[in-house]
Amino acid sequence: MSIAVLRFPGTNCEFDMLHSFKLLGVESHLVWHQEKELPKGTHLVVIPGGFSYGDYLRSGAIARFSPIMQAVIRYAKEGGKVLGICNGFQILVESGLLPGALRRNENLHFVSKFQKLAVVSNNNPFLREYAVSETLNIPIAHADGNYFIDAKGLEELKENDQILLTYQGENPNGSIESIAGVCNKEKSVFGLMPHPERAMEPLLGSVDGARMLRGLAC
């Protein structure tokens, strides 16, 4: 198992991801954004959080044009698994690999806290180790996490079982129907605003993210 963790200018969660996979005993490698190909034998691509290119224009809008993203798009179209966390989710949306858009938080503030989440679907490789309706406690940290999609797109998400996680209780950013994470129709590309890599050890206050990464890595 080889995992490619992408790194853009402004990415700041890449070493958290490497540490998380090390805890699971899985090999992972950083891949610089200027690379034109993914490493041979890549089984999973992770686009971690941060502020790629300073979030100028829109979060993820510039990173989408980095050379490595063409390789990621090809990889995803061939059925490869891709996980985008926070800024990674934004990059996946900007790249057209996931539907919808991520807008400024409704309260116009950066939000950083532990957040309760509900598992909506486990019929996918990302959440297969969780039970439907299970409550998770995973940190969020973002200013542009307000997920939006039009009425037709929302209906398609529901019909295709693409809504995987929702915020439980308080909606921290105004996301439509409290959506926290969605996947593509093929269930091979998943984007979420919460940070599972920050919920890997008891010392961090939660281990609820561990099963997500373990399910992908093992």
Swiss-Prot record:
<feature type="active site">
    <location>
        <position position="195"/>
    </location>
</feature>
<dbReference type="Pfam" id="PF13507">
    <property type="entry name" value="GATase_5"/>
</dbReference>
<protein>
    <recommendedName>
        <fullName>Phosphoribosylformylglycinamidine synthase subunit PurQ</fullName>
        <ecNumber>6.3.5.3</ecNumber>
        <ecNumber>3.5.1.2</ecNumber>
    </recommendedName>
</protein>
<keyword id="KW-0658">Purine biosynthesis</keyword>
<keyword id="KW-0547">Nucleotide-binding</keyword>
<feature type="active site" description="Nucleophile">
    <location>
        <position position="86"/>
    </location>
</feature>
<dbReference type="GO" id="GO:0004642">
    <property type="term" value="F:phosphoribosylformylglycinamidine synthase activity"/>
</dbReference>
<keyword id="KW-0067">ATP-binding</keyword>
<keyword id="KW-0436">Ligase</keyword>
<feature type="domain" description="Glutamine amidotransferase type-1">
    <location>
        <begin position="2"/>
        <end position="218"/>
    </location>
</feature>
<dbReference type="InterPro" id="IPR029062">
    <property type="entry name" value="Class_I_gatase-like"/>
</dbReference>
<dbReference type="InterPro" id="IPR010075">
    <property type="entry name" value="PRibForGlyAmidine_synth_PurQ"/>
</dbReference>
<keyword id="KW-0963">Cytoplasm</keyword>
<dbReference type="GO" id="GO:0004359">
    <property type="term" value="F:glutaminase activity"/>
</dbReference>
<keyword id="KW-0378">Hydrolase</keyword>
<keyword id="KW-0315">Glutamine amidotransferase</keyword>
<dbReference type="GO" id="GO:0005524">
    <property type="term" value="F:ATP binding"/>
</dbReference>
<dbReference type="GO" id="GO:0006189">
    <property type="term" value="P:'de novo' IMP biosynthetic process"/>
</dbReference>
<dbReference type="GO" id="GO:0005737">
    <property type="term" value="C:cytoplasm"/>
</dbReference>
<comment type="function">
    <text>Part of the phosphoribosylformylglycinamidine synthase complex involved in the purines biosynthetic pathway. Catalyzes the ATP-dependent conversion of formylglycinamide ribonucleotide (FGAR) and glutamine to yield formylglycinamidine ribonucleotide (FGAM) and glutamate. The FGAM synthase complex is composed of three subunits. PurQ produces an ammonia molecule by converting glutamine to glutamate. PurL transfers the ammonia molecule to FGAR to form FGAM in an ATP-dependent manner.</text>
</comment>
<comment type="pathway">
    <text>Purine metabolism; IMP biosynthesis via de novo pathway; 5-amino-1-(5-phospho-D-ribosyl)imidazole from N(2)-formyl-N(1)-(5-phospho-D-ribosyl)glycinamide: step 1/2.</text>
</comment>
<feature type="active site">
    <location>
        <position position="197"/>
    </location>
</feature>
<comment type="subunit">
    <text>Part of the FGAM synthase complex composed of 1 PurL, 1 PurQ and 2 PurS subunits.</text>
</comment>
